[in-house]
C-alpha cells in the first residue's frame, strides 16, 4: 500500500512562515491552483524574498522558506494532477533543490520516478504538470525515468549519479524511493573510492577552467575555486562514503573538527548572502559577479564607501572566504583520500630529520606540537619543500596543525631571526616561488610572515586592465620571473631568458616583485609607499647598502620601462637619454626589463603580445647602447639618416632598381622619415613606389609581422582629415592601431605608417589584407570628410568612467608638441581625435596608442601648419575640444 508520508530526509512541511511572509501553498484554497493565481502567488513570494532580505533576514532563512514554498506547491500540484493515490510513482527533488538550496533564481530540478514506464495517460498528466510549471515561469529541469533507467543512467554519468545521491522525496511512493536510495548507496553503484576519484578529477578540471584561482575579478560564486561547488564536493563525498547529510554529521564521523565546521558554515553564509543578493538583482539565472553587477550587489549587502569602495570591500571579503574554503577543501579531500582510497595509511613514513617525515610525497610533522612550540619551524618546513623535489604538498594532519598554529602566532614570523634566515635562503633557491612562496601564499603563511602582505590579500581593482587581485597578481609575477630561468621559456621571452643568468643575486628581483604592489589600496603613490616598505624589510633582513638601493629603486620605478616603451616616443634620442639617466647602470636595466615583462604578463593574460615585446626590446637595446656610449653622447641625426639610406640601398641594389628614380623619390622626403623607419622598411616602401604611378595613392600591408604587428603604409596626396579617415576605416574593421608615423613630403604627399593588430593582439590575417586595402583606398580618396556614425559602446565599458585628461609634456624642441591623452576607450576615438586636430589646423606627426583596460593613454606628436609647437592659447583650445568631444553628455 502506497503512503504519502515523507521520509525523514525531507524538508519539514510544517515549517512556520516568517513574519510578513505570503501564505504557503498548503493553505491555499483548491481553486487557487490555476496558472494565473499560482503566478500571482509566486510573484508576491519573490517580491517578499527581496524585501525580507533587505530587512535583515538571513539567506539561510529565506532559502529554507523558498524551498518549503516550492515543496508545498509541487506536492499540491502532484495531487491535483491525479497522482495522489497512484502507486509506484514518486516526485523527487534532485541537485541543489534536493539539498534544499533554492536561491531566488535557482533551477528546480525534478525526477519523476516510476517502477515501470508511465502509461500514455500518466505521461500526458506529467506533461501537463510540467507545462503549468513553465507557464508560471518556474525554471524547471526534469527527467522522467524508471528505477532501472535511473540506475543505468547514473552508472554511466557522474552528474546523474551525483544528483541521485542528493535526491529527496517530495511526494509519492516511499518504498519506491527507498529502493532507489538502497541501490545508489550500494557498493555496486559508484563505489565510494571510484566516486571520490571522479569528483576530485571533476573539481580539478573545473578549477582549470578558472585558471586555478578564485581571484579572477569577475568570479563565479558557485564554480570558481573556493566557491560553493568546493563545499558541495566535500558534502557529496561525505554523503556517499559516510552517509553524512550535513556538515554537522561530518564532525560526528571525525573528519571535520567543530572549529572547521564553524569555519565552513561562516564561509557558506557569506557566499550564500552574495549569491542571494546577486539573484535578486538579476532577471535570469547567473552566478557570475560581473563588473556591471558588483556595485548594486555590494550596496544591497550594505557595504559602504565612496565610488567603488563598496565593491572593493565586498570582493575582499569574497576572496578571503574562497581562500579559506580552498584550503579546507584541499585538507579534507586529502583526509577522505586516506580514509577512502587508503593510499598512504599502510606506508611507513620516511624520516627526513628530527622534525619532519615524508608520507608518500607529502611532508608530515613528527611532533604535532612543533609549530606551537617553535613557530620558525613553519619556515623550516617550507624551506624543506623548496629543497626536496620529492615533496609535492603538506600532509592533511600537518596542514590542520599549521592552520591551528597560524591562528595562535604572537608576532609576525619575520620578527624571528631564524625564520628570516630561512626565508632568505629559500629565495636564493631556484624553486623558491613554485615550491615555496606559492604554497606559503595558499596557506596564508606569507601573510603570517610579512604583515604588509595582509593588506593586499583579496585587494581588487575595479577596472578591465587588472585580471586578478593584487596578491594573486604578485604571485603570478613571481612565477613568471622564476620561469625565465628555464630554457623552455625562451620561445616566448628570449630576451629575459638571456638576461636571467646575468642578474646579480636573482633573489633581489623576487624581493622587489613581492613589494612592487604591496602598497596598493592604501592611498597615495603605491610605488613610493612600497619603496618605503622595502627599506624596512631590507634593514630587518640584513641586506647591504647596494642590495637595498637596488630593490628600493626597482619598486619605486617598476612602471618606468612600461610607461616609457608604450607611451613615449622611444625613437627620439632625447627620450632614450632621459630613460638611461634614470636607469644609470646596465645591471639595473637587466633587472628592470625582467620585472617589467613579468608584471605585464601577470596583470592580464591578454596584454602580452609581439608588439609590446618589440617595444621593450627596442627600448632595452637602445638604452644599453646609450649607457655604454655615455650620457654625454647623442647620435648625430645626419649620420643616422645616411646610415639607414645606405643599408636600404644595399638591399635594393640586389634587385637592380633604378637608383636615379630612387634618389628622386628620397629627395622629396624629410630627414625624419629615414630616422623613424628601419632599412628594411625603407627598402619595402621604395620597391613598391618605384613601380607605382606616384600621382596616385598606394596602400601596402606588410606580408610579415613588423615590430609585432602588421604595417600599413599609405602614399597619398596630403589633405585635412586624412588621419581621421584612415582611423575611422580601421576602427570600422575592428583593428587596433598601436603606432602611427605621419610624414609629408616636400611636395605635400602623405607617407603614413600604421602598426595595427587584431583585437586579440595578433598581426592581421593575410586573408583580410585585400578587403582592408580596398576599404582604405575608398576612405582616402573621398573628396570630403564625413564623420562616421557613432557606434554603440561595448557593454563591458558602459559601467566605467574615465575623466578625459589632456596633458602637454615638456619637450626639448620648439618645433613640435607632445600631447598625452587619457580617456575612456570608446569606438572611433582616434578618428575623433584626428578630426579635432584637422578642425584646428594642427598637423599630426606621430602617435603611440596604448589601451589599458577601459582606459586609453595615448601620445600624439603634433605641430602647427608652419611646423612649430603649439602656443598656450592653442594648447588650451585643443584641451577644451578633446575634453568636450570625448566626454559626450549622452554615450551612444
Swiss-Prot record:
InterPro entries the record matches: ACT-like_dom_sf (IPR045865), ACT_dom (IPR002912), HD/PDEase_dom (IPR003607), HD_domain (IPR006674), NT_sf (IPR043519), PII_UdlTrfase/GS_AdlTrfase (IPR013546), Polymerase_NTP_transf_dom (IPR002934), UTase/UR (IPR010043)
GO terms, biological process: regulation of nitrogen utilization
Chain segments carrying region Disordered: 1-20
Activity regulation, short description: Uridylyltransferase (UTase) activity is inhibited by glutamine, while glutamine activates uridylyl-removing (UR) activity.
Listed Polar residues bias regions: 1-15
Residue ranges, annotated region (Uridylyltransferase): 1-351
Domain statement: Has four distinct domains: an N-terminal nucleotidyltransferase (NT) domain responsible for UTase activity, a central HD domain that encodes UR activity, and two C-terminal ACT domains that seem to have a role in glutamine sensing.
Short name of one Pfam family: GlnD_UR_UTase
Keywords: Hydrolase, Magnesium, Multifunctional enzyme, Nucleotidyltransferase, Repeat, Transferase
Residue ranges constituting the ACT domain according to the UniProt record: 711-790, 818-892
Keyword Hydrolase on entry: yes
Domain HD: 470-592
Cofactor(s) required for function per UniProt: Mg(2+)
Reactions mediated catalytically: [protein-PII]-L-tyrosine + UTP = [protein-PII]-uridylyl-L-tyrosine + diphosphate; [protein-PII]-uridylyl-L-tyrosine + H2O = [protein-PII]-L-tyrosine + UMP + H(+)
PROSITE patterns given in the database record: ACT, HD
Family as reported in the entry's similarity comment: Belongs to the GlnD family.
Function recorded in the entry: Modifies, by uridylylation and deuridylylation, the PII regulatory proteins (GlnB and homologs), in response to the nitrogen status of the cell that GlnD senses through the glutamine level. Under low glutamine levels, catalyzes the conversion of the PII proteins and UTP to PII-UMP and PPi, while under higher glutamine levels, GlnD hydrolyzes PII-UMP to PII and UMP (deuridylylation). Thus, controls uridylylation state and activity of the PII proteins, and plays an important role in the regulation of nitrogen assimilation and metabolism.
EC number: 2.7.7.59, 3.1.4.-
Highest taxon above the source species: Bacteria
Annotated protein name in UniProt: Bifunctional uridylyltransferase/uridylyl-removing enzyme
MF (Gene Ontology): [protein-PII] uridylyltransferase activity; phosphoric diester hydrolase activity
Renumbered residue ranges of the record's region Uridylyl-removing: 352-710
